[in-house]
UniProtKB/Swiss-Prot annotation:
Transmembrane segments: none annotated. It comes from Gluconobacter oxydans (strain 621H). The gene is lpxK. Pathway: Glycolipid biosynthesis; lipid IV(A) biosynthesis; lipid IV(A) from (3R)-3-hydroxytetradecanoyl-[acyl-carrier-protein] and UDP-N-acetyl-alpha-D-glucosamine: step 6/6. This is Tetraacyldisaccharide 4'-kinase. PANTHER family: TETRAACYLDISACCHARIDE 4'-KINASE, TETRAACYLDISACCHARIDE 4'-KINASE, MITOCHONDRIAL-RELATED.
Length: 327
């Protein structure tokens, strides 16, 4: 049901397949470096980017939401910029959480728009100008680490602590969008999500602000204790959501992974409803998936939000201090 990455991408040693594909990785790296040398627009307000260099989910959207809320708590008026992956609109346009649809603007922007004004557009510079004209005093980019059109005062590289950088190779030989040294040279901070199983943190350059955090379910998880649930998710790494439920003591009797940014079809909905009726269970999904579910089916599904738990509570505040000192 999901498109799983090749196994050799995640092996610590480079396989024969990876070695055979390396010439194509060299071409991809050359093109990326050339694109990153394009002229950059400097916005009149601070710009923070939460991005990654691997395919699949790393937790950058929960990080974006966490930092946006902290900016609001400081009295700022942050606006969020997103590419709008999966949507038809090219932008720049504002996302209306009550009127915009996932097929128009994408699923992540709809989720982000529930927390702060959110704009989508392929041209980040043009989108930034529009957001600033509408009152933004700082901008937070959800993804866009490899987008050169808008200068980033602070670039935060988000790394999954379990998978790390995989086999260390660039697409298609590995999961990376660019070489790790290139990314670290542009970043000002690195946030490792989850256990640092590859002991990456000590290897990062000392000038980078490094932090560690993990994703935990929201308080609504308590209502599921002792209940039989069927969990489904169409995110970058659905198994992370299922594992999070198990760690919270809510083990699904069945887990259904869907591709990232998946649009649920009538057939999908019928299947999920049938599973719920047959087993007498509660359907559970993510907030990102919930925005794509049609009414009234959405009311039949329990939505579990995700929160960020920082290893050092001072880390996010240091990151925001860095943003305003750099701009």
């Amino acid at each position: 049901m999901t498109r799983r990455p090749p196994r050799f991408w995640l092996r610590p040693t480079r396989s024969i397949a990876a070695r055979l594909l390396r010439p194509f990785s060299f071409i991809a790296t050359t093109l990326t470096r050339r694109r990153l040398r394009q002229p950059t627009f400097h916005a009149s307000v601070p710009v923070l980017c939460c991005g990654n260099i691997t395919t699949g989910g790393t937790g950058k959207t929960p990080l974006t939401l966490d930092l946006v809320q902290r900016l609001r708590d400081r009295g700022h008026h942050p606006h969020i910029l997103s590419r709008g992956h999966g949507g038809r609109e090219r932008g720049p346009i504002g996302v209306n959480p009550n009127r915009s649809t996932p097929r128009d603007v994408g699923d992540e922007p709809l989720l982000l728009a529930q927390s702060a004004p959110t704009w989508i557009g392929a041209d980040r510079a043009e989108t930034a100008r529009l957001a600033i004209s509408q009152g933004a005093d700082c901008l937070v980019m959800d993804d866009g680490f490899q987008n050169p059109t808008l200068h980033q005062d602070v670039s935060v590289l988000v790394v999954d602590g379990v998978t790390g950088f995989g086999n260390g190779c660039v697409l298609p030989a590995g999961p990376l969008r660019e070489p790790v040294p290139d990314a670290l040279a542009r970043a000002q901070a690195v946030v490792v999500m989850g256990d640092d199983r590859h002991n990456l943190i000590p290897t990062f350059p000392p000038h980078l602000l490094t932090a560690q955090a993990r994703l935990v379910p929201g308080p609504e998880i308590r209502t599921l204790q002792g209940r039989r649930i069927v969990a489904f998710a169409g995110i970058g790494r659905p198994e992370k959501f299922f594992d999070m439920l198990r760690d919270a003591g809510v083990a699904p009797i069945r887990s259904l992974p869907f591709p990232d940014h998946h649009f649920y079809t009538p057939r999908d909905i019928q299947r999920l409803e049938a599973l719920s009726r047959e087993s007498g269970t509660t359907l559970v999904t993510t907030a990102k998936d919930a925005v794509k579910l049609p009414f009234p089916f959405r009311t039949q599904v329990k939505v579990i939000g995700v929160e960020l738990l920082w290893a050092d509570p001072k880390s996010p505040e240091r990151l925001l201090d860095l943003l305003f000192s750099a701009s």
